[in-house]
């Protein structure tokens, strides 16, 4: 690519919605995608999930992004072109792109199928790709990525309700598998019942795990038990309920994306077990050491999942009919959707109908 102009490197005209500054407000945006390389898959985007991370990123709350920024970590569509050396898929296949579009391929994490922990991981938006240009996410008409980071989307899964699996799904599936919280008969606590939390309940039940949902309010009790199949519900602000649940859980998956007290949660764990934080937040938690030490309990965290885990998760979801509960929205509703996400006013995930509602900018 050396010596080539940006237009030569990225000859394919594309469009989407982008944030231009830390207000996070999105508006129509024209840009370009690279030509399809030998190992690339070009994707016509039909649906894109919207997550709390998109809101944080659009506002650059993590302090690591540049503008303009096209969000979208949960992308589903149709393969429209494949490179000459692509072996996993063909034109016309249903495919998906998740959190990553690249990594170094050489570090310990990459060679051991843990690309999401590569120090040079390239996320689907807001990062610099191997050719030195910015990556743009799924709030757009099309994308192109190396086949390693493009997944076969099972025919059995509905595309709209399946889109959130690409981030929210793998973000709960991966820690359950890695930390052994997927064993039938185990008792798992799920903190928070949002985009990640409701999928955590669904995956856990499919694994044969007993699930207790933990929330700050009783409002979601009916949804948790009657709609999602949870076995029990605890209100974390109710001291009597928390005391009754003391020492009953084999593990906790905490999906809340903001800072909150974790000491009360540690009391729910059996000795020698884990609290796993998966809610993306830039804040710092107060970690009480004594409650950990006396029960040899531990606190861990994960981010996303590997490419192998993502494909495995999609196939498992198809086998067990696991999809997200979604509200499908048009592209021009995205700023209202972001406001509602901030207010926790969604059950449980917004998905943009990109294929039918995204139109090219007028100028």
From Swiss-Prot:
GO molecular function, one term: oxidoreductase activity, acting on the CH-OH group of donors, NAD or NADP as acceptor
GO BP term, pick one: alkaloid metabolic process
Enoyl reductase (ER) domain boundaries: 24-352
Cofactor dependence: Zn(2+)
CDD domains, A to Z: CAD1 (cd05283)
Co-factor remark: Binds 2 Zn(2+) ions per subunit.
Coiled-coil residues: none
Localization of this protein: Cytoplasm
Positions with a binding annotation for Zn(2+) 1: 51, 54, 74
Protein name: 1,2-Dihydrovomilenine reductase
Protein source organism: Rauvolfia tetraphylla (Be still tree)
Taxon lineage: Eukaryota, Viridiplantae, Streptophyta, Embryophyta, Tracheophyta
């Amino acid at each position: 690519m050396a010596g080539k102009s940006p237009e030569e490197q990225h000859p394919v005209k594309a469009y989407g919605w982008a944030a231009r500054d830390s207000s996070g407000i999105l508006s129509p945006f024209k840009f370009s995608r690279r030509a399809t390389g030998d190992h690339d898959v070009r994707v016509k985007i039909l649906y894109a999930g919207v997550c709390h991370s998109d809101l944080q990123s659009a506002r650059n709350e993590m302090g690591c992004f540049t503008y303009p920024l096209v969000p979208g970590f949960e992308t589903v569509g149709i393969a429209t072109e494949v490179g000459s050396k692509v072996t996993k898929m063909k034109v016309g296949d249903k495919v998906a792109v998740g959190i990553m579009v690249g990594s170094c391929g050489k570090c310990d994490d990459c060679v051991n199928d843990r690309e999401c922990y590569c120090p040079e991981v390239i996320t689907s938006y807001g990062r610099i790709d191997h050719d030195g240009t910015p990556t743009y996410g799924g709030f757009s008409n099309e994308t192109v990525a190396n086949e390693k980071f493009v997944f076969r989307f099972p025919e059995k899964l509905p595309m709209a309700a399946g889109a959130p699996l690409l981030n929210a799904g793998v973000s709960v599936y991966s820690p359950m598998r890695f930390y052994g919280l997927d064993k039938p008969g185990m008792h798992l606590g799920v903190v928070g019942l949002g985009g990640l939390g409701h999928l955590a309940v669904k995956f856990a039940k499919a694994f044969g795990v007993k699930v207790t949902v933990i929330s700050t309010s009783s409002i979601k009790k009916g949804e948790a038990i009657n709609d999602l199949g949870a076995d029990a519900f605890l209100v974390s602000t109710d001291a009597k309920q928390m005391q009754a649940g003391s020492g009953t859980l084999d593990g906790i998956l905490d999906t809340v994306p903001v800072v909150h007290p974790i000491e009360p949660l540690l009391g729910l764990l059996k000795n020698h077990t884990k609290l796993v934080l998966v809610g993306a937040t830039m804040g710092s938690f107060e970690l009480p050491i004594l409650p950990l030490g006396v029960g040899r309990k531990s606190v861990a965290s994960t981010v996303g999942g590997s490419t192998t885990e993502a494909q495995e998760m999609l196939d498992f979801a198809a086998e067990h009919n696991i999809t997200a509960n979604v509200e499908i929205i048009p592209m021009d509703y995205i700023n209202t959707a972001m406001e509602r996400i901030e207010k926790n006013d969604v059950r449980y995930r917004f998905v943009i109908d990109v294929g039918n509602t995204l139109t090219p900018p007028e100028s």
